[in-house]
Amino acid sequence: MVAREVIFDMEADNLLDNITKIHCLSYRYVDTPNEVTTLTDYSDIKGFIVDGPCEDAVLIGHNIIGYDLPAIDKILGVTTTCKTIDTLPLSWYLNHGRSVHGLDSYGEDFGVL
């Protein structure tokens, strides 16, 4: 079975050391780009992480290993068994001459911000 790719991002109230609240988690499957789901209820976010698309999916996001997934574990006490692809270290590796690797910087470069 070919794994489905799920792009996700979450927003919270602070950096990891001081986080107290997850505002939302949004995701979409790569093969259905016009269908974005946003979760704000903690039980729904837990369900996505624990029981969600993981059996047949790869979670993809920017800094998910360094921030999103640890933040979810810190606030909700759950971890994922999904395979993950973190685009931040990929950016460091593929664009080693770039001084900034944040999504805002890429958004400016591509004219979407």
Residue map of PLM features:
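Conserved DEDDh/DEDDy metal-dependent 3′-5′ exonuclease domain
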Residues: 2-8, 16-17, 22-113
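Conserved Rossmann-like nucleotide-cofactor binding loop
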Residues: 13
